[in-house]
Amino acid sequence: EVAEYAKETGDVTICVECVNRFETHFLNIAEDAVKFCKDVGTGNVKVHLDCFHMIREEKSFSEAVKTCGKQYLGYVHVNENDRGIPGTGLVPFKEFFEAIKEIGYDGPLVIESFDPSFEELAGNCAIWRSFAKTGEELAVKGLANLKAIAETV
């Protein structure tokens, strides 16, 4: 019903996020999310991939992106495995960006991180330490790292 309403209301896309199994049993991997989008069948429901969750659930970042394809990939969080500064941890960003380029995705890539000083959110997301001196530092360094990786693709 929500997807139908969004479609009737205007050019509204709903993106469903794949979240790791420690937080939910619903839509943990890209394959499940694409199936969900197809089952809804309205054409305005897409997949939201999040690197933090992907590193826990997907066997391959590139295969997850290719499973979505341009048709179903609608939004991306480019964050690190610990939700810290992108490009400083375990996420295979080069592989991820190559796959994104291959499918022709041209939507948003958003850094998502959390500051432990925002206690309610930090507690809900299990963030117990700082990843940078300020949120600005995290964003600036993360963006610089991601741009450097993207330049190699």
Please annotate each region the language model reported.
Residues E1-K46, R56, R129, K133-V140:
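Active-site acidic/histidine proton-transfer and metal-coordination neighborhood
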Residues E1-K7, V34, K38, V65, ...:
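A structural alpha-helix within SAM-dependent methyltransferase catalytic domains
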Residues E23-N28, L49-K59, G84-V91:
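Active-site glycine- and acidic-residue-rich loops that bind
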Residues V40-V45, C68-G74:
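Glycine-enriched alpha-helix->loop->beta-strand junction motifs that scaffold or abut catalytic
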Residues V19-R21, D50-R56, V78-R83, E112-P116:
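Active-site beta-loop-alpha junctions enriched in small/polar residues
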Residues D115-V153:
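Aromatic-rich peripheral "rim/lid" segments of glycoside hydrolase catalytic domains that contact
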Residues I14-V16, V45-L49, G74-V78, G107-E112:
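Hydrophobic faces of well-ordered beta-strands that scaffold small-molecule active sites
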Residues I29-V34, S60-K66, G89-F97:
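Charged helix-capping and loop-helix junction motifs
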